[in-house]
């Protein structure tokens, strides 16, 4: 298990063209990123559509690569993924997908600040893990309304996840106004050492490996994580050239919200304990996006502003712009840039061994998660989409009504304003993201 940055996860989401509200805890954010990333070749048998006109199917093969280069704690995430959608009738669509995160690299298992008398840098440990996730769902469409439901099961050596999601939407005013309401519920379990609830947080130990997890091993325990996610979206087309989207998202989290592998130095003598976070967290975000098509340039320009706040006192702001242009009828390109900034969590300190207020303890909690420190980041990137359209009787490659391929690249740089490893600035603050995807409809 390793924790990836919220911004890296957000970048990965954008690479795949999906917008989600991140509501996972620190221990599971890497899993969410894995859900969005995909790399390596996927082989899938493609079946010709049946002659019946009501039968429509599409296949998506996604590939992407996340790399966080570093001399001591580099990280690589690859994830083959495939999705199949079949419509046996004009009102029902069935979906199924599979993905497998393949994670490798090194991570510092001990966090200490400028005053720590412990060698933090050489504490990086190498790891490798694979996560498998299966999703099944359906969509019912009737006139101007639709209902979608899905279930996902994910498993890896030290984590189990069960989640369902439901969304409903409608459009009116000649389809110029669209409303969407979504709810997701997660029932997760994370493996930790077998400390008792009555044990003092300062005496709890971190995991050193996943051996024995989810077995009868008396040195291991399973902790629950409850996730509730809500989202409300309003999309409005004002003119043929201008449209906006307003999205409100909220999340409630309860349970073990730390990293079971990470220890924090909490005393001048070098005493260390398992990372200790509050068991409850509420999160909210409000985003506004506008898109305007300039006919003279044949280019669509977009702007996005997003504000984030949670009960751990983190306040984040995201600003993004992009431009999309058809170079040819079959080739579309997009360039974009994004800036993100956030404040620190209420209990954050780079060093928990000193005194208040510049450094030292922050109440009863301590953390080694850089995503709870004050930081900012910028992202630049782009993607290209190639589409080949066919028609009945003249299919692409003899089987597809439509075939498309997309390639994307993003560069992400993070500025950590108050996070060190034993007084040293981490060198893993750059992330590179590649994506490659194919879609066939038949």
Where are these regions (language model features)?
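Short glycine/proline- and aromatic-enriched beta-strand/turn motifs that initiate or cap beta-hairpins
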Residues: 52-88, 95, 412-415, 426-428, ...
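Transmembrane beta-strands of outer-membrane beta-barrel proteins
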Residues: 57-61, 94-96, 145-149, 177-181, ...
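Outer-membrane beta-barrel translocator/channel fold
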Residues: 97-134, 178-242, 254, 335-383
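Outer-membrane beta-barrel translocator domains and adjoining extracellular loop/strand segments
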Residues: 71-76, 97, 107-112, 152-154, ...
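Outer-membrane beta-barrel channels and translocator barrels
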Residues: 89-91, 142-145, 173-175, 239-241, ...
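Transmembrane beta-strands of outer-membrane beta-barrel pores
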Residues: 63-69, 100-104, 142-144, 153-157, ...
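Outer membrane beta-barrel transmembrane domains
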Residues: 113-124, 248-291, 307-318, 324, ...
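Residues on the lipid-exposed face of transmembrane beta-strands in outer-membrane beta-barrel proteins
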Residues: 82-86, 136-140, 166-170, 232-236, ...
């Amino acid at each position: 298990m390793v924790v990836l940055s919220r911004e890296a996860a957000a970048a990965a989401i954008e690479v795949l063209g999906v917008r989600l509200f991140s509501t996972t805890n620190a221990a599971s954010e890497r899993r969410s990123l894995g859900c969005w990333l995909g790399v390596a070749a996927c082989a899938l048998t493609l079946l010709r559509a049946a002659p019946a006109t009501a039968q429509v199917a599409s296949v998506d093969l996604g590939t992407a690569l996340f790399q966080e280069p570093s001399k001591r704690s580099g990280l690589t995430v690859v994830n083959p993924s495939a999705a199949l959608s079949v419509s046996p009738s004009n009102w029902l669509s069935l979906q199924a997908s599979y993905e497998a995160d393949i994670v490798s690299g090194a991570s510092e298992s001990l966090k200490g600040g400028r005053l720590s008398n412990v060698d933090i840098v050489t504490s990086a440990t190498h790891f490798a893990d694979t996560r498998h996730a299966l999703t099944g769902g359906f969509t019912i469409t009737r006139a101007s309304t639709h209902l979608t439901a899905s279930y996902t099961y994910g498993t890896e050596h030290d984590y189990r996840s069960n989640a369902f999601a439901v969304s409903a939407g409608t459009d009116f005013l000649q389809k110029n106004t669209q409303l969407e309401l979504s709810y997701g519920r997660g029932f997760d379990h994370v493996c930790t050492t077998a400390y008792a609830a009555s044990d003092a947080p300062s005496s709890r130990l971190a995991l050193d490996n996943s051996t024995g997890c989810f077995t009868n091993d008396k040195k291991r325990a399973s902790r629950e994580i409850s996730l509730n996610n809500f989202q409300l979206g309003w999309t409005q087309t004002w003119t043929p050239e201008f449209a906006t989207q307003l999205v409100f998202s909220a999340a409630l989290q309860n349970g073990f919200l730390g990293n079971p592998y990470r220890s924090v130095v909490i005393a001048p003598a070098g005493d260390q304990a398992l990372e200790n976070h509050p068991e409850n967290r509420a999160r909210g975000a409000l985003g506004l996006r506008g898109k305007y098509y300039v006919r003279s340039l044949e280019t669509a320009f977009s702007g996005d502003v997003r504000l984030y706040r949670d009960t751990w006192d983190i306040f984040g702001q995201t600003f993004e712009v992009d431009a999309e242009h058809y170079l040819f009828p079959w080739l579309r390109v997009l360039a974009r840039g994004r800036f993100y900034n956030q404040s620190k969590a209420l209990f954050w300190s780079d060093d928990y061994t000193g005194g208040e207020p510049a450094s030292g303890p922050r109440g009863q909690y301590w953390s080694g998660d850089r995503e709870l420190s004050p930081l900012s980041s910028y992202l630049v990137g782009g993607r290209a989409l190639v589409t080949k359209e066919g028609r009945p009787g003249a299919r692409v490659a003899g089987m597809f009504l439509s075939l498309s391929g997309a390639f994307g690249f993003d560069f992400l740089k993070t500025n950590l304003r108050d996070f060190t490893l034993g007084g040293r600035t981490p060198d893993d603050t750059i992330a590179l993201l590649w994506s490659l995807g194919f879609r066939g409809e038949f």
